[in-house]
């Protein structure tokens, strides 16, 4: 079972990917983790990726696909995997398909966790982080006992730059421009499945399990 997770930043696709991985005993693979592991282990591909990252440049698609295909060869991927954070663009999706088809494989499901922009802006701009211990809260869904003060250590809470409404809007516009076309791409291949991400987390997961069987 080869699964790709799609959805805007803040849609909750990472959380769902972890839940899928646990239920179906397949690895949750994120490109960030692959980069970190290869750089830490000083692999040839990791060294190549690091030269781009050190310059603040994007790692080329071909290299990312090489890193991912390398990860797929590991024993824990024998029954499939959940890929999170890749592909983000049509060229990346095409490169991944080409690499998979060379092994006689293809993507089984592309699951799109759908959440309207306004919900995502509310979700993310309501997040708060503790300056002391790093604990995270949400003013609506997971508030602290005393407003603006961490339950765990008593330090004050802040709104991180990443979660400010303007930053979230910018990230969403990049998503719509670059990643949204993937929805049509995978729909054309007959593997797209959409779930309503505005539901409670467990209901979203139940909908995904219904799709995967």
Curated annotation (Swiss-Prot):
Zn(2+) binds at residues 130, 133, 150, 153. It comes from the Bacteria. Residues 30-59 are annotated as: NMP. It catalyses: AMP + ATP = 2 ADP. Its EC number is 2.7.4.3. ATP binds at residues 10-15, 127, 136-137, 199. One of its GO terms (molecular function) is zinc ion binding. The keyword tRNA-binding does not apply. Transmembrane segments: none annotated. Residues 126-163 are annotated as: LID. InterPro entries: Adenyl_kin_sub (IPR006259), Adenylat/UMP-CMP_kin (IPR000850), Adenylat_kinase_CS (IPR033690), Adenylate_kinase_lid-dom (IPR007862), P-loop_NTPase (IPR027417). This is Adenylate kinase. It comes from Lachnospira eligens (strain ATCC 27750 / DSM 3376 / VPI C15-48 / C15-B4) (Eubacterium eligens). The lineage of its organism: Bacteria, Bacillati, Bacillota, Clostridia, Lachnospirales.
